[in-house]
Every structure is written in C-alpha cells, then in structure tokens.
C-alpha cells in the first residue's frame, strides 16, 4: 500500500531532474552555434607596403614582421576606420607607437583610432573569452607561432565543423585555425582584445603618451 505513495513522492524529483537535463542540453546547443565576422583579409606582404621599414628597425619590414599591425589594420577596417598596414606603420613610427624599434605598443591602437577602438586586454589563450568576444561581434588578435617565430592572426569566428576561423596576415587569406596551426588550446599563446569606446587618456599633443609607452613596453610588448 505504501509503494504507490513512494512513486508519487518521487515524481517531483524526476520531473525536476528532467527539466535540469533539458536545460543543460539546451545550453550546450546554444554554445555550439556558429559565429562568423566577415572581414576582408589583408597581407603584410602586399607590395604597396611590404618593403617599408617596420618602425625604426634596421632589419625588419612590414612584409617580414608586420603581422601584428596587419592584424590590427583588418580589425580597424572592420570598425570603419580607413587605414592600411603602410599608413598605420607610418603613424606608429612618427607617434611613438613602437617599443624596441618595431614592437607594437597595443595601447597605441586607442590613440590612433581617436578612441573609437580601445585596447582592453592582453590575456592568455582563454577559449571562453574568445568565444564571448566573437559572439559580441568583436574580432580578437591572437599570438601564435609560425615556423617557430612569433606571429599574429585575427580571429573572426568559429564553426561547428572547422573550429576557429582566422584572417592570416602572412598568407593574406581566411582559413581554419585548426587546419593551419592545430589545436587552438595549444596553438594560441595569448590574445589581445579591443572594445569600441571612448579615449583612455593615452594621447598627449597628438602622440602616444610617454607613460603609455613605458607601461606598454614593459608589460604589453615582447
């Protein structure tokens, strides 16, 4: 006589468990949706700027080592800022936007864009952050290694079949991250994130401030 009562007593627990399971499955499906940002690829080896000296480097050019500024240029173009790697490089050189001759000071992006795009973070290879940024339609600059050398690409989306999608400045193409650099949990060394917003006080008389240079050179440039 007590057995039916036991079953009745368990029903709320079973129903609650079923609801929780359905919610978990729904969250997983939502997290697996595809996100892509259409950004035209650019090549650091384009003849229009490839031969230009990178910053004040005695040896490097935009073509040989301008991957970071080319990745940033593609991002800036996405935000409707009319520029290209050659123009960006010239401005950085004239306005103290490089540390140690040719290493991009990421804060300089804020000054260059007049505050329309602000550098917001130098982070580790956090795929959760990457997905959140892409879901918010904000491309992410990622540090990788190409033939043992430091390289930067622009993360523009992710798909169910191919994983992360990138614009690669060295090759000037759009390609799957996995196809070129392997597992992103290993292949991505660090990321740079950016927001659309107001200036952060990094301009002094039209130049990147010395304080920003000193801090960025020590903390943000390699």
Go through the PLM ranges and name each one:
Residues 2-15:
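Bacterial N-terminal signal peptides that target proteins for export
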Residues 12, 22-97, 146, 160, ...:
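Active-site-adjacent structural segments surrounding the nucleophilic cysteine of cysteine proteases
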Residues 16-20:
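Hydrophobic membrane-insertion alpha-helices, especially the h-region
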Residues 57, 120-165:
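Active-site-adjacent substructure of cysteine-protease-like catalytic cores
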Residues 82-128:
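Catalytic cysteine-centered active-site loop
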Residues 99-103, 149-153, 174-175:
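Extracytoplasmic/secreted cell-surface and envelope-processing proteins
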Residues 164-182:
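Short solvent-exposed strand/turn elements
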Residues 177-199:
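A recognition module on extended beta-rich or small alphabeta surfaces enriched in W/G with H and D/E
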